[in-house]
């Protein structure tokens, strides 16, 4: 066994056990708290550093002892509440701590305090040692409250909740802290010893030079610690609210409660139970016998839990139990007189102070305490949370509930469902009645009893359910089969029920928010008879009253109809006779307990006769102040209401007055009403906000700003204040930033320049974008720099005064000293240079310069007027037309072809701002701009003249050079002639020399010379010739290449000539010598041949070289260009060829499409100049399509796929596994308005198995389909619930559960075309051909014989119809009468068809464009009423039709309600005359030429805003579109069809005043419904109109309709005018008189319907500000023409804004783009209901389930006689001729929803075997019976049976629904939030077989 303990696994488990033990964890956290070194260590370290000797040792010991004792008290105070409260009181800390620390500081500064060191015999009597002990003790106690406790110290408090044995954890943590403290002190001692013994310190030169330095430092240590202590005190004094200096806020009176007078003021009993620490929460499982009780007068602003005890005087006692945390420490500061409850005694003494005693006990204390510590004052920087529903700010206090143990599933578990006051009071009562309890139940017994009770209830419910199913199997349709709805009855005999809203047993539309019973237990019947009102039982009764569930359950007979009917509540409210005796004892206990609470010496008869408890209500904790900010104060002043001064500090801003209108002087603006006060001035001001961080952030005056969080600034000027935790998220750190973008840009720029030729155009665009981005970054940097400079001037003290004075000085110097001096100097210089002076021109420019005084942000005022408070707020000086000194003035006309951008750039210099240094800048605080230099034009002129002189000199030099060339040429010719003459003379001399042979050798040299000259002359001629050829053929003589070629040619010729000379000389020598020597002639001839051949060879080489050199450069260029062209052509041809292929394929597809849709092409509307409306055109096509489909029954007839959803097509394509996307590649890649070839898509779906129809089987297409059966069955089941897909605002219009009753009535009674979709006939019968493979069959047929293949086809066909229902709904969109594109064997007669078409269109105008069936549920009675349902809507839909109508409007007067029958009825909408004239709503479109002008039907309201001009949308090929209207409808497809355009929101209420003249209203067709009529009026009207023929009731005359529509508009205006008065009376105390209708319209619009943001356009905002700046200047000028023209040229003034009229309507403002409407989310009242029904809508049992069971609002009113009549009526509505028991389709529906959920929940609770058999035992054992019920009903299809067997009895189907409704059943609470997940216990996962 010993060896086994050393196994690694056992060692690890042992190690983990030791580590996770309470002792080790306590030691660890206690050791960590040692590291939380705070200011409490100051005294301890000072004793270590300063004290020496025997007394120093004693002081060190006393300091350590006091420090440890203080820390021990802190640990004890965590669990000892009185000590914690005493240490944590704000009074104690503020009054005692700071004076003590300040006193200690001044005491320590006494000179002889630390100097006297007399030894004493009893050291503990020494005052200094005692003070050291007390200092360390007290400062340690203050550490957690007045000084900051670090996070490490709080870990002990945080971890306390995780330990079961609290005291053991505290002890171990203290021991750990002690160990850590000892180690820390030892380490400090070692450091001191090391410092004293270190040789380096001793040998230091400074210390050796001053040997008394160490002793002086030791003596001054006391002062150093005193200074540190003083700094700490001052710092934390700033963080504690000053009791005297804080601002006193003006409180407002609380709303008085009804029936409560001053005598009946509530007495508040408070139990303060606080934990020590910032987030310490006191658990109620601790010993509360030592809780501190205290009381004070009622504070109506605090959260109270009222235990109201009814009596004669109705005295109210409120018990309030507060848990105060560190976060809310300074909020509430009540004064308490404490008294203790002795928990060991049998009776407690609860001392309650009387008001008479309060008067003389608190008259001295209360004013002082209120002055020092006002709990209602905003001393701490708290947020003021505004709420429209609650006037005052809500206190940020503790939650209403907290974690407490409660019984759940028979076990005690922690639940977040308990108010702390109730938990504390219940625990107190438990301690008081402990001796009454004979025995205590253990947890196992509790669980066994609970499980037994749960099993018993489950068995009873199961038996009841089985019996009901068996009775169904016997076909006994007794009323007892269906469980009736239980009503809560007040009187059994008279059948008086509670109101439906407050009936806890009702659901659906009558479900209300009430507080149900907190426990199933109740008191006895005798007590119930005494009290007429039912008493609500709370958790206290669960402690006092116990009931034997065994006996209680036996009294309930689950199969007894009487117990399930109206008497059911009596069985729950009665007890058996055997228990009455026991209950008497409990009533005594009740009397004893509540007498404790109620007894008061002044009032002994509070509650003696009967004992009862009312509900525990909660009062919202609020502050007693209603604070306003600056904006609200100004709004109140504008509305002429008396407003208080604002208490909330807004962002730092300054009010800059830009215009002051003195009405005494301005006669044009004088009003007769305001003429009483002649000195009244009207100021126009702008608010200038500071650009720095908002350190105020809505802080309240008087609160301590030092306690604000997140007030750290990282930069000098930044937009927002950052938290220290977010510093790492800053883009650029301050110290470690290195911008490498500049070097990279330079490198990239150089690289671009080097490789310019190889770059393409894309890179050029990127380069431009980079340049633009660089410009933007530069602009941002400059703007940031300007903001920093402006804020620096604004933040420094007296900076604005200095800057303003300097600017004024600079302005005067510039205008009157500097510029005139420069003008004088310039003109004198011109006279000295013999130029004409320009005095007049310069003085004119100088006079034109204007120095305009501006506000700090640049708003122009005037030249003479200074801004208001300019010395403190700042000033700018703007220079208009700044003077620039020019050396001369020239009058040149600007050429017309000049670049306008350059002109604009030149005009930027028309104004500038003056800086402090006298410089000019473009923007305030910007960088100085470069001035135009005075000498720059002079230098330019000099440069021009120098350039001209250089040009002339160059021409002269060129001529001289040519002359020299001619001279050289002439000299060369002369030299040549002389040379030839000499040669001739030499020849003569040579001839003469032959006579005399003596001078032989002398005559040979001249001869040689002559031959050489001759050859040289010839060679020179050839060289000159070649050079001339090269020069003549060259294209660029002065290019570098030609120069190289010439040089090379000359060099080559020179070398060749030299070779020839040498050869010729040798030849001559040889020849001359051979004549003398007589050599052989053969050898000489051979050499001559060699020389001649070499000469020819070199000549050829020379010519070829010359030619090659001359052509090489052009050859290279041509070769490169050829390569480039080939590559470019190849690249261009690639997309061209691909485009051709694509166009050819597209052309083929379009031809096929046109060929397949020839019938559709003929029906495309041709646009003319008439007006048509899209509904009439669509319906014309629909009727023609339906006629074609009837004629072509046996042909291939498809409908136009006019509204196929792109999203759905892509979804189906993605879901299909065997599809090839190559065919749809062009469509998938096209992002615009995709021209779907919808017939091909449909065919492709059928071929690939995505959709199935008759055509698939008709053509014998049998392809294998790959499906995931399980997933697709689940998807199919979900998709079959399409009818629950309500639109959002209609869900919110409906009440909770209303769709089960009222909506379904509309659905079944009026809309017959939709039941055709949902009924078995139209869903399953799709025009079967009478063939062998697919015979005509009906679900009404009881038996059918098909072979296996036919059965497979039929089941497969039906199944895939369920899968592809959405596909058919989209593809076969236009045939509204049938979801398929084919006819049906069962066709209704024409009259019925017309009638239901008529009613469908009249009631369901929303379905004209979108085909969601649930839209047809609502009639005209269900139109959203904007007046009453704004608060119920999750989104404020400002496009709702009747957004400002008080009365509901019949949509028939607005919407086209005419339809065309197949053959007989041909009513066409044509009466659009009145609408086309009223441009308020409509736009003109083109009308169908084929429409009949004789038949007219009603006016048409453009509710979609789609009647725009077709010509405004260019369509090059209309044949590619299905209808012209759908081009316009494409954008509306993205918008929900229940909305109207934004332009209709801005309804011009005053635009149609003239319409209501001379109008004859047709009372028979009045479109206004009275407001007191019910919603069923639509149902009644519809039923009446169904009986009328279509031809009679469906058509009215033009005059009636015109008058009707005009009456609607006139009534709207009347309603609007009435709404003006109502809104003014409600929202204004003093009614404001409107000066114009526009103002009234805007005010009414903003007040009643401003649920969205009206914001300005950003660019418009800047333009308006610029205009305002110019206006302020122009209003002060006498002759503003010049300034106006220059402002317009500079772009400062925008003429578009000047065109905005004063009386523009909202519609026109919207049209101009001035106002932009943004919808805003609203707080929703019924948000929980919306989420609930959205969640469980897909989990409802079947789409036909609601058609019968929830048609009737009260099922208990159904009797047996009307049962079959009800079924027959239902069948008639669903167009089924046999009896159809839809409600019995699911056997579980027999039970009521509450019992249904209860049965499932109880089955799941008892599923001990995890395989799921036990929980479904009831259902699994009775599946056969269910099957029998289903098989006997032959009309039910097999798919439904399979669906039941597979899905209906599985637990996961209902899990979400059960969780959604769990609050109502399991917890017996109905607080309106059925998704409060903190109260729902999630069940364990159950296995699904």
Curated annotation (Swiss-Prot):
Residues 255-303, 1610-1633 are annotated as: Disordered. One of its GO terms (biological process) is protein transport. InterPro entries: TIC214 (IPR008896). It comes from the Eukaryota. Residues 279-293 have a biased composition (Polar residues). GO terms for cellular component: chloroplast inner membrane. Residues 255-265 have a biased composition (Acidic residues). It is found in: Plastid, Chloroplast inner membrane. It is a multi-pass membrane protein. The chain crosses the membrane at residues 11-31, 67-87, 88-108, 127-147, 175-195, 224-244. The keyword Transmembrane helix applies. Belongs to the TIC214 family. Part of the Tic complex. This is Protein TIC 214. It comes from Gossypium barbadense (Sea Island cotton). The gene is TIC214.
């Amino acid at each position: 066994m010993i060896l086994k303990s050393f196994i690694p696994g056992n060692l690890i488990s042992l190690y983990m056990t030791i580590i996770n033990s309470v002792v080790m964890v306590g030691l660890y956290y206690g050791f960590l708290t040692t590291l939380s070194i705070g200011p409490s260590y100051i005294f301890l370290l000072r004793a270590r550093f300063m004290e020496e000797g025997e007394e120093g040792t004693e002081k060190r010991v006393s300091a350590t002892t006091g420090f440890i004792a203080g820390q021990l008290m802190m640990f004890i105070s965590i669990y000892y509440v009185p000590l914690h409260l005493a240490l944590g009181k704000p009074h104690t800390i503020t009054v005692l701590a700071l004076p003590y620390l300040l006193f200690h500081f001044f005491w320590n500064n006494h000179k002889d305090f630390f100097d006297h060191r007399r030894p004493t015999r009893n050291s503990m009597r020494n005052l200094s040692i005692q003070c050291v002990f007390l200092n360390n003790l007290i400062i340690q106690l203050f550490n957690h409250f007045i000084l900051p406790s670090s996070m490490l110290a709080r870990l002990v408090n945080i971890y306390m909740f995780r330990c079961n044995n609290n005291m053991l954890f505290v002890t171990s943590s203290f021991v750990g802290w002690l160990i850590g403290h000892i180690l820390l002190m030892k380490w400090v001692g070692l450091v001191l010893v090391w410092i004293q013994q270190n040789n380096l310190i001793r040998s230091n030169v400074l210390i050796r030079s001053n040997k008394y330095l160490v002793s002086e430092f030791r003596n001054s240590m006391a002062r150093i610690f005193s200074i540190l202590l003083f700094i700490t005190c001052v710092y934390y004094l700033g963080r504690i609210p000053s009791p005297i200096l804080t601002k006193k806020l003006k409180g407002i009176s609380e709303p008085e409660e009804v029936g409560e007078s001053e005598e009946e003021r509530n007495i508040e009993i408070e139990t303060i139970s606080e934990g020590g620490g910032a987030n310490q929460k006191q658990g109620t499982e601790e010993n509360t016998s030592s809780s501190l009780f205290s009381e004070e007068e009622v504070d109506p602003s605090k959260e109270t839990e009222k235990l109201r005890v009814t009596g004669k005087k109705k005295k109210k006692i409120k018990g309030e139990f507060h848990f105060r945390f560190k976060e809310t420490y300074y909020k509430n500061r009540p004064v308490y007189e404490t008294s203790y409850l002795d928990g060991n005694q049998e009776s407690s003494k609860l001392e309650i102070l009387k008001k008479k005693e309060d008067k003389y006990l608190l008259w001295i204390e209360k004013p002082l305490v209120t002055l020092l510590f006002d709990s209602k004052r905003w001393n701490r920087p708290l947020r003021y949370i505004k709420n429209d529903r609650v006037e005052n700010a809500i206190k940020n206090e503790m939650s209403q509930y907290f974690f407490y143990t409660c019984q759940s599933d028979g076990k005690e578990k922690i639940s977040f469902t308990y108010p702390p006051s109730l938990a504390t009071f219940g625990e107190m009562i438990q301690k008081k009645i402990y001796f009454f309890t004979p025995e205590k139940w253990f947890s196992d017994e509790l669980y066994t009893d609970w499980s037994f009770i749960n099993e018993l209830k489950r068995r009873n419910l199961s038996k009841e359910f089985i019996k009901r199913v068996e009775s169904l199997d016997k076909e006994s349709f007794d009323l007892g089969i269906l469980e009736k709805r239980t009503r809560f009855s007040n009187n059994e005999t008279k059948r008086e029920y509670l109101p439906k809203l407050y009936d806890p047993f009702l659901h659906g539309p009558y479900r209300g928010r009430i507080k149900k019973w907190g426990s199933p237990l109740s008191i006895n019947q005798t007590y119930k008879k005494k009290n007429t009102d039912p008493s609500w039982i709370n958790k206290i009764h669960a402690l006092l009253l116990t009931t034997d569930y065994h006996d209680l359950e036996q009294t309930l007979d689950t199969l007894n109809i009487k117990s399930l009917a109206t008497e059911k509540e009596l069985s729950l409210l009665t007890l058996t006779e055997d228990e009455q005796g026991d209950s008497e004892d409990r009533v005594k206990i009740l009397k004893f307990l509540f007498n404790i609470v109620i007894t008061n010496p002044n009032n002994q008869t509070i509650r003696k006769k009967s004992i009862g408890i009312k509900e525990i209500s909660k009062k919202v904790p609020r502050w007693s102040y209603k604070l306003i900010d600056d904006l609200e104060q100004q709004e109140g002043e504008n509305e002429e209401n008396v407003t208080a001064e604002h208490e909330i500090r807004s962002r730092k801003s300054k009010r800059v007055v830009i215009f002051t209108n003195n009405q005494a002087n301005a006669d044009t603006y004088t009003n007769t009403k305001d003429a009483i006060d002649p000195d009244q001035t009207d100021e126009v001001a702008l608010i200038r906000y500071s650009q720095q961080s908002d350190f105020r952030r809505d802080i309240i005056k008087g609160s301590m700003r030092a306690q604000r969080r997140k007030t750290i600034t990282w930069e000098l000027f930044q937009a927002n204040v950052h938290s220290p935790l977010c510093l790492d998220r800053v883009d650029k750190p301050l110290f470690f930033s290195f911008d490498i973008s500049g070097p990279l840009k330079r490198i990239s720029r150089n690289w671009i320049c080097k490789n310019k030729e190889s770059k393409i155009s894309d890179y050029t665009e990127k380069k431009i974008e980079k340049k633009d981005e660089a410009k933007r970054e530069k602009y941002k940097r400059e703007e940031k720099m300007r903001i920093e400079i402006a804020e620096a001037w604004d933040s420094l003290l007296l900076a604005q005064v200095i800057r303003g004075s300097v600017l004024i000085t600079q302005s005067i110097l510039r205008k009157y000293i500097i510029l005139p001096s420069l003008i004088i100097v310039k003109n004198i210089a011109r006279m000295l240079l013999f130029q004409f002076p320009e005095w007049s021109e310069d003085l004119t420019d100088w006079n034109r310069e204007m120095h305009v005084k501006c506000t700090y942000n640049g708003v122009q005022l005037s030249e003479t007027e200074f801004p208001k408070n300019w010395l403190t707020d700042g000033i700018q000086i703007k220079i208009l037309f700044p003077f620039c000194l020019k050396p001369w003035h020239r009058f040149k006309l600007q050429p017309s072809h000049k670049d306008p951008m350059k002109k604009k750039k030149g005009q930027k210099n028309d104004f500038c701002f003056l800086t402090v240094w006298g410089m000019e800048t473009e923007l305030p605080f910007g960088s100085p701009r470069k001035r135009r230099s005075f000498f720059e034009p002079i230098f330019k002129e000099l440069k021009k003249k120098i350039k001209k002189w250089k040009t002339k000199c160059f021409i002269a030099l060129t001529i001289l050079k040519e002359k020299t060339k001619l001279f050289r040429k002439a000299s060369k010719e002369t030299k040549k002639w002389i040379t030839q003459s000499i040669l001739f003379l030499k020849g003569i001399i040579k001839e003469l020399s032959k006579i005399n042979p003596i001078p032989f050798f002398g005559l040979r040299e001249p001869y040689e010379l002559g031959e050489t000259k001759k050859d040289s002359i010839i060679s020179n001629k050839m060289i000159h010739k070649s050079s001339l050829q090269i020069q003549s053929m060259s294209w660029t003589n002065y290019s570098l290449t030609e120069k190289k070629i010439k040089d090379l040619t000359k060099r080559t010729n020179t070398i060749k000539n030299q070779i020839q000379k040498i050869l010729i000389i040798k030849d001559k020598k040889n020849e001359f010598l051979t004549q003398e020597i007589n050599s052989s002639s053969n050898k000489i001839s051979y050499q001559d041949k060699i020389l001649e051949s070499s000469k020819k060879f070199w000549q050829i080489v020379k010519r070829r070289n010359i030619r090659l050199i001359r052509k090489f450069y052009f050859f290279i260029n041509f070769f490169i260009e050829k390569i480039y062209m080939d590559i470019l052509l190849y690249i261009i041809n690639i997309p061209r060829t691909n485009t051709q292929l694509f166009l050819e394929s597209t052309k083929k597809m379009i031809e096929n499409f046109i060929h397949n849709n020839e019938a559709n092409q003929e029906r495309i509307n041709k646009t003319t100049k008439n007006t048509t409306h899209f509904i009439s055109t669509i319906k014309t096509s629909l009727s023609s399509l339906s006629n074609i489909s009837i004629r072509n029954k046996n042909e291939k007839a498809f409908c136009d796929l006019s509204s196929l959803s792109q999203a759905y097509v892509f979804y189906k394509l993605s879901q299909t596994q065997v599809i090839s996307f190559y065919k749809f590649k062009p469509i998938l890649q096209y992002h615009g308005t995709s021209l779907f070839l919808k017939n091909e898509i449909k065919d492709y779906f059928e071929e690939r198995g995505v959709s199935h129809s008759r055509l698939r089987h008709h053509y014998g297409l049998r392809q294998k389909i790959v499906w995931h059966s399980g997933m697709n069955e689940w998807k199919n089941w979900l998709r079959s619930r399409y009818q629950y897909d309500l639109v959002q605002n209609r869900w919110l219009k409906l009440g909770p559960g209303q769709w089960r009753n009222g909506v379904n009535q509309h659905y079944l009674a009026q809309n017959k075309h939709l039941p055709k979709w949902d009924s078995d006939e139209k869903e399953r019968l799709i025009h079967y051909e009478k063939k062998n493979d697919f015979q005509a069959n009906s679900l009404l047929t009881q038996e059918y014989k098909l072979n296996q293949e036919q059965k497979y086809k039929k089941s497969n066909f039906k199944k895939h119809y369920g899968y592809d229902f959405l596909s058919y709904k989209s593809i076969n969109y236009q045939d509204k009468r049938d979801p398929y594109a084919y006819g049906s064997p069962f066709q209704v007669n024409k009259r019925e068809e017309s009638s239901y078409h008529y009613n469908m269109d009249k009631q369901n105008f929303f379905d004209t464009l979108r085909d969601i069936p649930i839209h047809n549920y609502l009639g005209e009675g269900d139109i959203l009423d904007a007046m009453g349902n704004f608060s119920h809507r999750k989104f404020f839909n400002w496009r709702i039709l009747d957004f400002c109508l008080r009365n509901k409007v019949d949509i028939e007067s607005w919407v086209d309600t005419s339809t065309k029958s197949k053959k007989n009825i041909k009513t066409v909408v044509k009466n659009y005359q009145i609408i086309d004239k009223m441009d308020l709503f409509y736009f003109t479109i083109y009308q169908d030429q084929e429409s009949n002008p004789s038949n007219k039907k009603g006016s048409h309201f453009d509710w979609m805003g789609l009647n725009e001009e077709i010509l405004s949308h260019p369509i090059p090929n209309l044949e590619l579109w299905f209808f012209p209207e759908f081009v316009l409808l494409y954008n509306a497809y993205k918008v929900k069809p229940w909305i109207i355009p934004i332009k209709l929101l801005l309804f011009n209420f005053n635009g149609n005043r003239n319409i209501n003249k001379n109008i004859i209203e047709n009372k028979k067709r009045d479109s206004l419904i009275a407001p007191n009529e019910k919603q069923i009026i639509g149902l009644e009207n519809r039923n009446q109109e169904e009986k009328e023929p279509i031809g009679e009731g469906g058509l009215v005359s033009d005059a009636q309709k015109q008058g009707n529509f005009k009456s609607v508009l006139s009534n709207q205006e009347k309603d609007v005018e009435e709404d003006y008065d109502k809104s003014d009376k409600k929202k204004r105390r003093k009614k404001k008189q409107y000066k114009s209708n526009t103002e009234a319209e805007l005010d009414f619009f903003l007040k009643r319907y401003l649920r969205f943001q009206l914001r300005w356009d950003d660019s418009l905002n800047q333009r308006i500000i610029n205009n305002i700046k110019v206006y302020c200047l122009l209003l002060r000028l006498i002759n503003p023409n010049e300034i106006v023209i220059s402002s317009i040229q500079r772009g400062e003034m925008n003429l578009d804004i000047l065109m905005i009229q004063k009386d523009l309507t909202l519609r026109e403002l919207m049209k101009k783009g001035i106002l932009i409407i943004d919808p805003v989310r609203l707080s929703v009242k019924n948000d929980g209901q919306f989420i609930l029904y959205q969640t469980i809508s897909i989990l409802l049992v079947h789409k036909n389930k609601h058609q019968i069971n929830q048609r009737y609002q009260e099922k208990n009113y159904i009797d047996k006689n009307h049962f079959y009549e009800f079924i027959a009526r239902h069948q008639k509505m669903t167009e089924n001729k046999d009896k159809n028991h839809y409600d019995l389709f699911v056997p579980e529906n027999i039970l009521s929803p509450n019992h249904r959920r209860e049965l499932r929940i109880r089955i799941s609770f008892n599923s001990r075997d995890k395989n799921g058999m036990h929980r479904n035992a009831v259902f699994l054992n009775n599946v056969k019976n269910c099957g029998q019920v289903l098989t006997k009903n032959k009309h039910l299809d097999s798919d439904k049976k399979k669906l039941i067997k597979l899905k209906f009895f599985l637990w996961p189907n209902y899990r979400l629904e059960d969780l959604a409704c769990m609050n109502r059943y399991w917890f017996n609470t109905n607080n309106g939030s059925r998704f409060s997940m903190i109260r729902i216990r999630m069940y364990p996962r159950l296995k699904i077989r």
